[in-house]
Amino acid sequence: MCSSDLGNTMEGCPVKFALGLVSGKWKLRILWELNQQEVIRFNELQRRLEGISSVMLSKSLEELERARLVHREQYPEIPPRVEYSLTALGRSIDPYLRALGEWGMQAYEAIQAG
């Protein structure tokens, strides 16, 4: 399925391409939290992602927005209100996140069993 000479392009390896979109310590967790909400504001998202700095959250959200997985809506209000949600492409990751969670449970149980 993957050809190493084509790098991270879709033609080279769809798995590498997909992992490139969601790689990093926080992106999958951000996508999971956004998947649980219709829309969420920055501070609420940061509270749910215990340990993430505002700089890292901003950077990760910007990268996910550039990848067209996340939509950012800024309202012309004072104080400013910004809400984040998944795009249709972002929502399409749902079954894969759930499958990853199921695999995580199996791996956890196997590791605990020794």
Question: What does each model-found stretch correspond to?
Answer:
Residues 15, 19, 97-108:
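Hydrophobic alpha-helical core bundles mediating ligand binding, dimerization, or RNAP-core interactions
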Residues 76-99:
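Basic, amphipathic "hinge/linker" alpha-helix immediately C-terminal to the N-terminal HTH DNA-binding motif
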Residues 68:
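Glycine-centered, phosphate/nucleic-acid-interacting loop/turn motifs that mediate DNA/RNA or nucleotide
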Residues 1-3:
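Short, small-residue-biased leader/transition segments that mark boundaries at the very start
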Residues 72:
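Short beta-strand "wing" residues that participate in macromolecule-binding interfaces
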